[in-house]
Amino acid sequence: MELDEVIQGIVSAIGGFDYSDDEKVYVLGDEALACLKDLKRYLQVVDEKYKVWQIRSLLSSLQLVTNDICPILSDWDKDITNYRNWRIALACVELLVPLTWPLETEHETFRENVDVLYNLRQAQSNYKNSILSYKKGSVLSAILAVLLKPLSTPAESRTLRDKGIIRIVLLLFRNILQIDELKTKNETIISFAKAHILDLIVTLVSNLDEFEHFDVYILEIVYNLIRGCKPSALFSDASLTNSQTELNSLLLKESTQNRYLKRNAHTRHNRFGTMLSVQTEDRRFTIASQNIKTDGLDELDSHKRFRKRGTRRKHFDDINKSFFINTEAGTALRNFAVEFLEAGFNPLFQSLLKDLEREDPRVLPIHKMQLLYVQSFFLEFMRFSSKPKKTEEIYSNDYSFGLAASVFDQRALIMHNRLMVESFEMKQWSTFQASMLSMTQLLFTLRSMTLCSSEIYQRIADNLLSNIFYQEEILLLVYSALKHFKTQSFGYLDAITELTIVLLKELEKFSSAKQYLYVKKRRRNQKSVDSNVLESDEDEESSLINANAAVEDRLFDFGRYESRYCDNGCIDSFVLFLQCYQDLDSKQIHRAISFFYRIFVKQKCHVYLYRLDFLRVLDKMFNDHVYFSTTNSARQDFEQFFVYYMRKLSDALKDVPALFIELPFPKLTDTFYYLEYGKSPLFSIHGSRKGPLYETVPGLSHLEKVAAVVACLINENKSDLLDELKVQLNCLISERKLITLADENKYINEGGNDGERMGKNLKGDTDSFNTALLKDGKFRLLLELCGFEESDNNIDVQALWKLPNSVIIDELVEHAMLLRRFTDDPPTFEGTKPEDLLVRKQRGNVRLPSSSEGETSDEEIEFEADDPITFANRREALNKITDRKRKKMKTNETIIDHTTRKKKENHLRSAKYIVDSDDDSETDIAFFQSEAALREKNAQKASALFKRIDDLEMEGKLQEIEQLSENSSSD
């Protein structure tokens, strides 16, 4: 027997209507309970086991719910003492749960399921309509009566079966809410309110200690009830005329649009008198309209057929789907939300927070999203429900913040931040969107707490804001989410733009109120290890700990953080958001304008907004008087920004004509300075930015040095640098030959400029070559071997190396021939690697003295830097001797560092007093002769002193050495 025949026989045996009776009462069959159990078993064995929807499809075609289940539940007398009738009603509820379960398709869904998907969804809509409206909602009352029996049992006496009945009834309520959610949300809320199901939910959450295992199902019901409803709509002053107000606004917008269209519409006569014809290679375009006289190009564009290129976009579930709520449903939902907030929000939130902390398997990823969304809704609802009436004299911010006290717990904030970071990293965009909504409402609530009259609430708000802004990870996460917006939903874009503006405002206020604001920054701290020292096990463990992510406190600079948003990605997101201005309200438009104001006016990043798409959006909004009319409250702020923007753009185009070419393209960091100021930036080359210094081992000839360096560069795959250097040398040789042919003396004395007399700068044609001039130590050594000199120019990289005039043309030709020889035939070294012939120089620490250092100090006498008998040199010699005797004393390191610093200071001081003067030449000659004699005398004393010190050292007389050093220093 076929399966459909079996199912049809079972359904027929359940019962049917008695048409002989005037009331047509439904009569149960003798085996009605057994038949209902058989249908449940078939659903489990066939549909759930094999993941097909065959039984569901058969039951929908037989209209089991409409013709059998609803009449059975409706005609039941709700007498829970009659076990047989109650058991039949329970069997009907057990069948309704799988039949109303949400239908979801996956990548591996069977083709047969996809074919019947539309019919099953239509059948579920009929199921919901029957359950809600059959005999004025008597079915919902019967379902609630089924639940009364396990609820009336004391908590300690409830069995697993009782808990299972509570669970399936709650799941049935959840399923009914999810079917045709947007279309029938108002009817569902009204039916649930009349059947006292909303009161049941409030009762369960207020006694959650007895029903702690059902917190997840209660969360799902509450989420589906409030999803898409704005709390502001529930507290509208004209709640009774909401539909009328919305209808009037739509009619006014339609009349304005019709009036605007009629003004520019075609008539019978405006097609005569003017014609434009354009002949192309393949066809002719002809337009007859009088608008060609003034708006010819626009008229041509209006006749184009734009074929928008299809893009494959990912569609994510928008959790904040809005719907219009009527008066009756709004009143019922508002009353439920008020009771839920007063009685059950804190217990439900604390219970779910515990489940998340212990990672309860009942909590699924979708429940995390629902919890965050419910939190954001009730935080906003709390401000509206507790908001006092606004009068002309006083306006208070004293809300009942205790209604949501569980949200202000430190544990809740930690969990929220964790969910926010995890959802972004795992690309769970719905959960991340809910976390952004929750963070936005939390910041709004904390702002209200700081403005209230209670000092306790003010301290709580200040503490929470400090904890939120202390996490730099969250601040950077918001910036990264805005920057990398791609194909998420519009609700996601709305949430991230709102959070960005609110976060910047609150962070600016908080940082300005605090003298110092620190944030926690994660960094990697790698421990330096000496290769010559063997570490113990403890050292290895400490190195592993130091290699992990370390945390440090860093002083927060709001201006620097705000400047991060001067980025093409962030601006792209807000431009895309503003392009939908026809669907935005005044607050959303004002939000976008305020962001552009921060970028353009406060941060003065004008160039980033000089974009053709942004200019097009502003122009379209300025000329649109239908969807962005003068009655819009954001129109005035927009016009002020638009006028200021156009004035700055006009001035920039006059000053930097290259901006005309850059308008259609995103701006790069390299060209930002030039487009902003019309000139190239000047970058200072700090000593730490330069690469390491190398030198060859002693004993090599010039030919061997060049061969070793070239071989090292070839082994490092840097032949392109050598090729470009050969090209540069050939160019320099050609220039020198031209100078020689053009009478070099005349060129130097008359025609040459200062830069060419000083030498020719080495300029690279590629970025890699210019980087090597600064960073590559081996390549810099090769330049020195080729006769180039490194200048003291710390502004431009291309002026860092130059070829002096002392290098003759024959030397240049020789260097070019050597490079060509070694690159064509790379040199080899028998038994030695070319890298072993190069050693790295030790670069000392550079300390720049302050302006007040060394100018008025009379403690020490200034000596010349090359004087062998300075105090620093004598002290250094003594330190070398004592270092041999006291290797383990740490004071030696301090003395050496001190003497090194003093030696550098003496060098700077003596160099400072060298004055270039040509007036006292005879005096200078006598002075230099006396100084030379003094240096010779001091050198003799030094040699005698060091000889005496060596003799005493051999005898081991350390005290006499120190006494001798002190006497020599006093001399």
Swiss-Prot record:
<dbReference type="GO" id="GO:0000076">
    <property type="term" value="P:DNA replication checkpoint signaling"/>
</dbReference>
<dbReference type="GO" id="GO:0044732">
    <property type="term" value="C:mitotic spindle pole body"/>
</dbReference>
<keyword id="KW-0236">DNA replication inhibitor</keyword>
<dbReference type="GO" id="GO:0031298">
    <property type="term" value="C:replication fork protection complex"/>
</dbReference>
<dbReference type="GO" id="GO:0005634">
    <property type="term" value="C:nucleus"/>
</dbReference>
<feature type="modified residue" description="Phosphoserine">
    <location>
        <position position="970"/>
    </location>
</feature>
<comment type="subunit">
    <text>Fork protection complex (FPC) consisting of swi1 and swi3 interacts with mat1 cis-acting sequences and mat1-proximal polar-terminator of replication (RTS1).</text>
</comment>
<dbReference type="InterPro" id="IPR006906">
    <property type="entry name" value="Timeless_N"/>
</dbReference>
<feature type="modified residue" description="Phosphoserine">
    <location>
        <position position="536"/>
    </location>
</feature>
<feature type="modified residue" description="Phosphoserine">
    <location>
        <position position="528"/>
    </location>
</feature>
<comment type="function">
    <text>Forms a fork protection complex (FPC) with swi3. FPC coordinates leading and lagging strand synthesis and moves with the replication fork. It is required for programmed fork-pausing which is necessary for mating-type switching. FPC stabilizes replication forks in a configuration that is recognized by replication checkpoint sensors. It is involved in termination at the mat1-proximal polar-terminator of replication (RTS1) and also required for activation of the Rad53-like checkpoint kinase cds1.</text>
</comment>
<dbReference type="Pfam" id="PF04821">
    <property type="entry name" value="TIMELESS"/>
</dbReference>
<dbReference type="GO" id="GO:0007534">
    <property type="term" value="P:gene conversion at mating-type locus"/>
</dbReference>
<dbReference type="GO" id="GO:0031297">
    <property type="term" value="P:replication fork processing"/>
</dbReference>
<keyword id="KW-0227">DNA damage</keyword>
<dbReference type="GO" id="GO:0003690">
    <property type="term" value="F:double-stranded DNA binding"/>
</dbReference>
<dbReference type="GO" id="GO:0003677">
    <property type="term" value="F:DNA binding"/>
</dbReference>
<dbReference type="GO" id="GO:0000403">
    <property type="term" value="F:Y-form DNA binding"/>
</dbReference>
<keyword id="KW-0597">Phosphoprotein</keyword>
<dbReference type="GO" id="GO:0043111">
    <property type="term" value="P:replication fork arrest"/>
</dbReference>
<dbReference type="GO" id="GO:0000785">
    <property type="term" value="C:chromatin"/>
</dbReference>
<dbReference type="GO" id="GO:0011000">
    <property type="term" value="P:replication fork arrest at mating type locus"/>
</dbReference>
<keyword id="KW-0131">Cell cycle</keyword>
<dbReference type="GO" id="GO:0006281">
    <property type="term" value="P:DNA repair"/>
</dbReference>
<keyword id="KW-0539">Nucleus</keyword>
<protein>
    <recommendedName>
        <fullName>Mating-type switching protein swi1</fullName>
    </recommendedName>
</protein>
<dbReference type="InterPro" id="IPR044998">
    <property type="entry name" value="Timeless"/>
</dbReference>
